[in-house]
Curated annotation (Swiss-Prot):
Function in brief: Acts as a CD40 functional homolog to prevent apoptosis of infected B-lymphocytes and drive their proliferation. Functions as a constitutively active tumor necrosis factor receptor that induces the activation of several signaling pathways, including those of the NF-kappa-B family. LMP1 signaling leads to up-regulation of antiapoptotic proteins and provide growth signals in latently infected cells. Interacts with host UBE2I and subsequently affects the sumoylation state of several cellular proteins.
Family: Belongs to the herpesviridae LMP-1 family.
Cytoplasmic side: 1-23, 73-75, 128-139, 185-371
Protein species of origin: Epstein-Barr virus (strain AG876)
Protein name: Latent membrane protein 1
Amino acid sequence: MEHDLERGPPGPRRPPRGPPLSSSLGLALLLLLLALLFWLYIVMSDWTGGALLVLYSFALILIIIILIIFIFRRDLLCPLGALCLLLLMITLLLIALWNLHGQALYLGIVLFIFGCLLVLGLWIYLLEILWRLGATIWQLLAFFLAFFLDLILLIIALYLQQNWWTLLVDLLWLLLFLAILIWMYYHGQRHSDEHHHDDSLPHPQQATDDSGHESDSNSNEGRHHLLVTGAGDGPPLCSQNLGAPGGGPDNGPQDPDNTDDNGPQDPDNTDDNGPQDPDNTDDNGPQDPDNTADNGPHDPLPHNPSDSAGNDGGPPNLTEEVENKGGDRGPPSMTDGGGGDPHLPTLLLGTSGSGGDDDDPHGPVQLSYYD
C-alpha cells in the first residue's frame, strides 16, 4: 500500500462506536445525584438569597436536565443539550450582572440580549426538528407556549423570591424538557421503523443490474454478425455487424467475431483502434507504410477509377441487399434475388479479377454467418 508522503502513514484503526461505557454512565449518575442534592438543599433551605437563589436553583435544574439527556439519549445532546447549556450560560451571566456596574454592566446586558436571541433561534431550530419528525401544528404550538410560559414564570419567581414558587418553576422546566425528550424518543424510533429497509425487496442497484443484464441478453439475441474473408491467410476483405441497434457498429469489449468494436486486440485487426494492424488501413495507428486512408473510421483501400474491370489488385467488390420481411422480429434477411431458404440470409457478391472467372488469385470469397 502506498502512503502519502505529506500526510505520513495511517494511524491505528479506530474502534467502532458503541454504547457508552459503564464508567461514564456511573459518573453521570453520580453527578446527577449530587446535582439533585444541591438543588434540594437550595430550594428547601431557609437561606434568603433573593434573586440569586432563584438563578442558582435554575442553573442546577438545567445541569440535571443535561445529565438526564446524557444518560438516556446521548444522540439528543445536540438540540436539547445545547439549548440547556445556552440557558445555563445566560443564567450564570445574570448572576454575574447582579454585582457589575458601569461599562461592564452595559456590556453584560448586550451579551445577555445576544444570548436570548441565540436561545430563541435554537428553540426554533428544535421545533423544526420536531416538525420533521412528524409533529403536528398543535403539538408544536403546545411546546412553544409551554416554553414561553416557563420563561414568564421564571421572571415571576425572580420577582417573588419565594422557595415554593422557585420549586414549582424548576419542576415545570424539568417536565418541559422531559416531555420533549420522550416525544423525540418515541417519534424518532417510529420514524426510523417506517423508513426501515425491507430486505425482502430487491436492492435498487440490484434491480438496475438485473434490468441491465436483461437488456444485454435481449440485444444479443437480436444481434447477428456477418464476416466475409478471403481465401488463404490473406487479410480479411469485409466485416460488418448487421444486428447492432441503429445499423452502426457496437462498442462492446468482446464480440464473437472480434469486429466492429474498439477492443485492444482483435485476431483480424480490422475496424478497430488498435495501434498496429497488418493492413495498416482503417485504424488510428501512428505509423503506416502506405500513409493512406488513416485516422478515418471506415475508409476503403485506394481504388483505381480507370480500371473498369476491377483488375487493380484491390479487394473484390461487395454488393449486399438487406430486406427485413419480418418487421422487427428475427435476424435481418439478405437476398440475392434468386429465392433460396427464406430463413437464412444470402449475400450477392461480386468478384475480383476478370468478371467472375475461377482463376482469381485470391480464391473464392468465403461467407461466415454467426448467430
